[in-house]
């Protein structure tokens, strides 16, 4: 039986709760979700053996990269070229520093759907505050 999102490729740059939960639902609906784990952000709940990680990252493939390295950022940009959807919930400016912001991704993937969910939005007086959801 086919599922509604069969054939849709999602590149998942999310962590904590809101992002992984959203992409889990998309994976449950058939999307091919590739979760990018930054090895320099490893915490207990981000370990592949932790029940929290298993709960919110089911139905996903996973790739661990050191985003402090240019080679990892370049690979991420290449994966963005092949994605239908790129989703992240990092703080404002993080993906721009990595060269994975909407404007950069759209230069080589004009049809990409780019979803961001920073805790306080991209602009405004609260935009620089880090939140966890």
Q: Could you tell me what each predicted segment is?
A:
Residues 1-133:
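N-terminal helix-loop segment corresponding to the beta1-alpha1 unit
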């Amino acid at each position: 039986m086919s599922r509604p999102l069969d054939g849709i490729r999602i590149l998942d740059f999310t962590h904590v709760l809101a992002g992984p939960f959203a992409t889990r639902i998309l994976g449950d609906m058939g999307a091919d979700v590739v979760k990018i784990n930054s090895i320099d952000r490893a915490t207990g709940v981000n370990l592949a053996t932790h029940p929290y990680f298993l709960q919110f990252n089911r139905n996903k493939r996973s790739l661990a990269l050191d985003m402090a390295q240019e080679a990892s950022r370049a690979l991420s940009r290449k994966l963005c070229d092949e994605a239908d959807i790129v989703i992240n919930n990092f703080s404002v400016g993080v993906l721009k520093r990595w060269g994975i912001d909407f404007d950069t991704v759209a230069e080589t993937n004009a049809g990409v759907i780019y979803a961001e969910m920073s805790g306080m939005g991209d602009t405004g007086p609260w935009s620089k505050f880090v939140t966890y959801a």
